Amino acid sequence: CVPLIGENRQLVRQGIKVMNEWQRVGLKELARVAQINGEVNEWNISWQLTPRINVAGRLDHANAAYRLLTTTDQAEAAQLSEDLNVKNVERQQKTQSIVDYCLNELLELQQDDSLLAFVSRGNEPWPEGIIGLVAGRLSEKLAKPVLVITKSDHGYKGSGRSNVEGFNLISQLEEVADDLEKYGGHAGACGFSLTVQQLPNFLNNIKKSAATKLSGLDLRPKLMIDAELPIDNIDLEVAEWLEKLAPFGQANPQPKLVAYRQTIRDINTMGVNSQHIKLRLGSYWA
């Protein structure tokens, strides 16, 4: 990821404007199947378009995404978009299935390590293209660094994610480099490969090393509030002012505002898996 500040922010901002001209029929069709109405923004790109493009390489071959982005034929673009949309649903289902498996294993084995590691069992490996997504979901839910490891043709491949401030995943891998074939990444995300013979030592050594590093850190997730905004001050002018700060992303996060002492009058769940909520606070919906 690159920080969305300075020149980078301006490039992305102009890029979004160009995207909204819909000069590429493939992107236009992909937006249709993603049910994007109106102009796209950085949220649509990150959570609706990009997952459908990336899924080609996660579950199959990236050629389908390449063809979608380069075709000038509307019928081909429509078919490729539909195919990628189906694969994206499959990706979501497989990701959730593996997350559920790992959470059940956590309960059964009563793991309480500072760094959690989950390894695929049996004869069916987990798709290498989605183990990073699984690690990210688990790390966010459990508030701990997580490694997800699956069988590969030549041993094992793994992916790690961490949101723990002060903990560096790539530094941890460097400390146990003798137990790995290859590795790479950065503080919050990593990927690695190792042989069958290396796996036991790797798991033992990295858990010990991580326990030492994490012993003095507060693993509880934190919500950092930028400012208090009384609910009566929320209006179109404020929304337009916040929009001028976009596009949001790395190093330029969307402002987190809080209104204290509010009474929830009504609540509705939204989304396929009820993963979103809609609240009514007094006469306001949020």
Region roles according to the model:
Residues 182-188, 214-223:
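Conserved short beta-strand edge segments in small beta-sheet-based binding/regulatory domains
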Residues 1-198, 270:
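Hydrophobic helix-and-loop "lid/oligomerization" segment in the mid-to-C-terminal part
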Residues 223-286:
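Accessory interdomain/linker segments of ATP-dependent helicases and helicase-like nucleic-acid enzymes
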Residues 28-29, 212-215, 249-255:
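Active-site phosphate-binding and catalytic loops of NTP-dependent enzymes
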Residues 198-204:
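OB-fold single-stranded nucleic acid-binding module
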Residues 177-181, 208-215:
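A common structural junction motif
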Residues 62, 131-132, 203, 236-239:
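Conserved strand-to-helix beginnings and helix N-cap segments that scaffold or border functional pockets
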